[in-house]
Amino acid sequence: MTNVKTSSLGFPRIGLNREWKKSLEAYWKGNTDRETFLKEMDEQFLAALQTQLDQQIDIIPVSDFTMYDHVLDTAVMFNWIPDRFKDINDPLDTYFAMARGTKDAVSSEMTKWFNTNYHYIVPEYEKGAQYRVTRNKPLQDYQRAKAALGTETKPVILGLYTFVALAKGYEQQDIKDIYNQMTPLYIQVLKELEQEGVKWVQIDEPALVTASPEEAAAVKEIYQTITEEVSELNILLQTYFDSVDAYEELISFPVAGIGLDFVHDKGKNFEHLKAHGFPKDKVLAAGILDGRNIWKANLEERLDLTLELIQRAGVDEVWIQPSNSLLHVPVAKHPGEHLADDLLNGLSFAKEKLLELTLLKNGLVSGKAAIQAEIDEAHGHLQDLKQYGAATNSAFAEERGKLTEEDFKRPTAFEERLRIQNDSLGLPLLPTTTIGSFPQTADVRSARQKWRKKEWSDEQYEAFIQEETKKWIDIQEDLGLDVLVHGEFERTDMVEYFGEKLGGFAFTKYAWVQSYGSRCVRPPVIYGDVEFKEPMTVKETVYAQSLTSKKVKGMLTGPVTILNWSFARYDLPRKEIAFQIACALRKEVEALEKAGIQIIQVDEPALREGLPLKERDWDEYLKWAAEAFRLSTSSVEDTTQIHTHMCYSNFEDIVDAIEDLDADVITIEHSRSHGGFLDYLEQHPYLKGLGLGVYDIHSPRVPSSDEMLTIIEDALKVCPADRFWVNPDCGLKTRQPEETIAALKNMVEAAKQARGKLAQTV
């Protein structure tokens, strides 16, 4: 008889009411002292554990909780602290400086965590650095949990292979030296856990899903060394987000258990298990519930899958768990949520997913009959959800059938469009602009709340938005920016705003997830066909344009980003959902153009994050992603300039796809890449319009004009000056007005100096 246990890989940090976010931001602003802040963090750490205990989960993780980011935690634990922060003597100040920067030191780079919408702080390797264990965070967290709750937990550590794969600053020939230097440090951390009496530790190695057999063999040597030194501690080697290509090598690792994703593996992990078996002396930790989407599980289907897994594996012990950490879904259904019952009953957040695991364990141990009532209830809820979505599933089929090849491309080549647009727009060399949003101050947020609570009328709220828009149009003109934006004061979120105005979307009030640091988002829920209802941005954009003789950009979010930043329906291919969104946006683009807007920006910051983890799957995704963008934008006249924006990505992977978008101008987050993208452009020139961010908007630091001039001049060594734009990294929504104005003033001055130097060379 196989012993079945429930396990959690990780739990959301932010709290049901975003208590974590509020504590962080109050501390950063100086509104709470350190003692209060640390006390609040400890309370939230314990609350997350208690929630998992309350769902009767057998094996609960610790050390997944963090004060900013778990990758940053790992870097700091092993003293991967860049030299520019070494003069900061306080450990907590150093930690936050690496994440957020200081007036003297730029923050570490931030990028996507695999193909999710979570962002991690990129570890920086520095040759000759003395790495050491600064503190054993997993041990401290284990001790805190045991002392406060009296329970055994499973410390979670980011594995060495994945940590190095996520880092930057090293050459290929450095990797062996890094492993040799870091392996004893991992052993030290694990040895201390072993001495404390810890029974299990979860070592996360998601990067192993893309490892070749040769790479996996090298990683196996690391674990051989570790387990020889730490023989009494049970190690669970955890993978997720896809299947493991080097499966045969993986199952030979000298560890006590292996975690596999049986949700996002496209069936491959199960195929591997059936073909090659599973070691009888290891625990199989089976990811059977979707940890990245919010739909209620089909309990009967999941039960049948798990029974077959148990039968095929033939092991003594199986852990059933989510496919990955529940970091990527909301904490729990909030009692104040306002969704229709048929939709709400079809959803399952982190807390509910753990309850589903407990139900499944009961079914596995006591038989299906023991949970038949719950199976029937879940089936009924899923049927109700399907019927709820079906109410919108009518309009798109006819429109999809009418699409032709011509709808997916602009009729005129870029070089000719560039000539026409240069004549039409009359912009200076190195035009300056921003990415779209301006600071959403307390006044802006308060006005929105008053409007939503019906304390303000629509007319009052619109008057306020127009007042803010006019204020920032005037500020932009005073600063000397060349292409202006209306500021997006009416928008809470760049996806939510559009989804609220399109058919097929639903929005929650409390279903928050962490994006980066304290930044939380409420992803829309796509439950039916997406449908254009009426213009969404025309009124605000046209009003802004009426206030200035300079060009004002229309600002839209692209179809792939809306898809990737939403919880998407599970009954349609993602490509088809993207095309539905694209058709709706196409109508909005046409409405903006008809209203006289000559520059329209369709942002795709999330294009790369949807990239499959395995390179062999990239072409298919990138093909339809580019098609969806072009479907949104290709119906405009040659005089209309299409911009797009991307952020937080390794762009080298997708340059061909960026070219395939056929946008006239692309602006890209650049300042945190520390010059890496320029090195790529030197070898692979990009000849369409390009704006590389000249300062980091995620940090309160205001860089000097000289710093920005250096970035511009470096960029002009590899980018044609006649098609280069000057802009910040991203939107300025989260910054304060004073620092925004100061930074933009320096940016405009840097552009003027660069133009002057170019004029002298002509």
Swiss-Prot record:
Binding-site residues for L-homocysteine, renumbered to this chain: 435-437, 488, 603
EC number in record: 2.1.1.14
Pfam families registered for this protein in UniProt: Meth_synt_1, Meth_synt_2
Residue sites binding 5-methyltetrahydropteroyltri-L-glutamate per the record: 18-21, 112, 519-520, 565, 609
Binding-site residues, Zn(2+): 645, 647, 669, 730
Alphabetic keyword roster: Amino-acid biosynthesis, Metal-binding, Methionine biosynthesis, Methyltransferase, Repeat, Transferase, Zinc
Cofactor note: Binds 1 zinc ion per subunit.
GO biological-process terms attached to the record: methionine biosynthetic process; methylation
UniProt: L-methionine binding residues: 435-437, 488, 603
Described function: Catalyzes the transfer of a methyl group from 5-methyltetrahydrofolate to homocysteine resulting in methionine formation.
Protein name, as recorded: 5-methyltetrahydropteroyltriglutamate--homocysteine methyltransferase
Organism: Bacillus licheniformis (strain ATCC 14580 / DSM 13 / JCM 2505 / CCUG 7422 / NBRC 12200 / NCIMB 9375 / NCTC 10341 / NRRL NRS-1264 / Gibson 46)
